Every structure is written in structure tokens, then in C-alpha cells.
Amino acid sequence: MKQLTRMIAALCLFVTLLVLRELPAQIPAHYDFAGNVTRYGSKYELLILPVVLLLLSFGSRFLLLHFHRKAEQTESDKERQAAAANAKVLGIVIFPQTLILSCIQGVLLYNTVLALRGESFLSTLAGDKLLTILFGALLVLVGNVLPKCKRNGLVGFRLSWTRYNDITWQKSNRFAGIMLVAAGIFGIVSTAFSPKGYGMLLLAVYTMAAIVISIVRAWQVYRAEKARERDRG
């Protein structure tokens, strides 16, 4: 699976490079929520997502090695179990994440080619819905794995409040995971009923709301845990 993940990331970059050869120097680079072009930029901006995918692919490999090494070398059973759990979570999430982001890159490439012909896939109802569904699926994926992460400094919903102790970490990551899943599902469902251009807008609103509410909840959990420790002391 790890090898397949790297192959997909490399294929995404390869296809992007092939398309770039046929594109002019300046291409549509930014769209509003209705899919209309609002800015033109260098065609090499299309390389951003494929490069990020490759970095995520190889970065996840080093993270897996880090967690596996920590699980083998630590003398604490608790830390060993946490490292093994984080390695498992990372191994589960990286493939579907790479696949979804590669699909998003494919949509962007297709839309760029159409935009140069005076058309736009993203400005159509189908394009808006497809992109919203892909981003919504990514939120659902991330939200599902957040509660499975154990306290660490590399992956998860990491704030100074959430990392205070295992209780604040577990409660905050579980809540943030639920909020992201809800945002993704609401976005996917909303796009079935929303007019053209509103799918991505609604998903962006849901995502921002989920993040803000999760941060506030993390602060509340941290305050409650500090108060509980003071009462015990």
C-alpha cells in the first residue's frame, strides 16, 4: 500500500508535467465559488499540489519509521502502544488522502484546459458538486482518524491545550474529529440541494465553523482539567 501511494503521487506529478508542456505561460489560476476566473498566473502553480503530494508521501514514510522506531526502542509500555497506534493511523490515512488529492488535481487540470478554450468545468453544477464531494470526503477521512491518534507532537489536533495531558488530548481530538466528519457530511449533503457555486462556499463555512468550535472546546476541556487537578491538589 505504501508503494502504491508513492506511485499515485508520482503519477499525479507526471501527468501534470505532461499537461504543462501544452499550456501557455499564463493560465487561469484562481476561481470564485461560482467557478469564474478571478486571477491569471503562471502555469507552474499547477505543480503545487503534486509536489505537496510527493512531500506527504515521503514525509509519511519517515513518520512511520519514527513511530516504529519509537515503539521498538522506548521502555514505556504506554509510549510503545501510543507510537504503534499513531503508526497504524498514519498507515491507514495516507493512501485515501493521496487518492482524493490526486482526484482534485485531475479536476483542476481538466478545468484549466477547458478554461483556455473559454469553457469551465468548475462553473458548471457538476463541477462544483464534484469538487465539494472530494473535499468533503477528505474532511470525513481526517475526522475519522483524529480520535485514533495518541498524544504526540507530530500528528493530530495539536494545540498547547490539547497536549496538556492524555485526557485533554483524547477529548479534544475526539470532538474535533466529530466536527470535521460533520462538516464533510453536511458539505456533501448540502451540495445536492444547493445552486451552482454554493457547494464549496457552504463547505468552507462548515469547515471554519468546525475548526473554531473545536478550538473553543479544546480550551474548555483544558480549563476543566486544570480545575480538576487543582481540586485534587
Locate each region found by the language model.
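Feature 926 captures the class I aminoacyl-tRNA synthetase adenylation module centered on the KMSKS loop
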Residues: 1-233
